[in-house]
Amino acid sequence: MKTKIRRGLLALLVCVQVFPALNAQAQRGADRLFSLPPLERAVACIKHYEGLHGPKNHPYVGYGHRLLPGERLSCAMTRRQADSLLRADLKKRLVTFRRFGRDSLLLTVLSYNVGEYRLLGYGKQPKSRLVQKLESGDRDIRDEYTSFCRYRGKELRALRLRRRVELALLYEK
């Protein structure tokens, strides 16, 4: 019994000494990330959450690019090619959302993951509440933005975390 308590106390002591160092390292990383221009933050965020897709992720290649009909891209692309493809995709989407001004990059990143039509609507798909709020001039969008955290009808904690990180990195007050 005493051995278990000693081990527990030793583990606690190690945690108390190690975690502040890890926290300081994480803070330096966050400072570096926030020192980047917004587009670079968006690219870093997408790369982190999407990862480099392989053959099992077809029809997605690179960092989440969805192959379009007639496109002949291989999943065996280099990181540099995938980065270039990601940036080209983001620039195309930025044009679509430029009317939202300082929120255009945030909407671009969200649309890269969920699709433009989930936000803007198309046919029977209505505009999202997020876009409706922004169009009316209301920028209190945290709840609407983080509501895009469902996959196949189920809420995923990882997606909710991703939305919070995107907001923290890209939302301009």
Question: Which residues fall in each region the model found?
Answer:
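Short N-proximal segments of mature Sec-exported proteins
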Residues: 104-118
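Early exported N-terminus immediately downstream of N-terminal targeting peptides
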Residues: 58-61, 65
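Surface-exposed patches in mature extracellular/periplasmic domains of secreted proteins
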Residues: 54-58, 96-106, 144
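Long, amphipathic alpha-helical surface segments
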Residues: 2-5, 12-13, 23-53, 65, ...
